[in-house]
Amino acid sequence: MAAMKSIVPLVMLTVLVAQSQLITQSEAQTCSASLANLNACAPFVVLGAATTPSSDCCTALQSVDHECLCNTLRIASRVPAQCNLPPLSCGGKLSWTNC
């Protein structure tokens, strides 16, 4: 019986860890799907593009979770260094307010 009492907390911990990993995977899939919807904004983020985004772009941007978008921008900002390139310098000020 004592062995059973010592196993129960271990089993509960294992279940909690597994559940948190499933939640994290689900959040990542939701984030990826939301980011894929931002393809509607692609025509508006190239040089010489129209200055007013479409309603589809605005709707897609509104539906993306703030943390999802900020995390993606943070990850993207590290890519040049990981490719042994200097950091990007865009001139002017870029604001990642609340990221």
Curated annotation (Swiss-Prot):
It comes from the Eukaryota. Disulfide bonds join 31-68, 41-57, 58-83, 70-90. It is found in: Secreted. Keywords: Disulfide bond, Secreted, Signal. GO terms for cellular component: extracellular region. Its main location: secreted. Stamen-specific. InterPro entries: Bifun_inhib/LTP/seed_sf (IPR036312), Bifunc_inhib/LTP/seed_store (IPR016140), NsLTP-like (IPR044741). Residues 1-22 form the signal peptide. Belongs to the A9/FIL1 family. PANTHER family: PROTEIN YY1. This is Stamen-specific protein FIL1. It comes from Antirrhinum majus (Garden snapdragon).
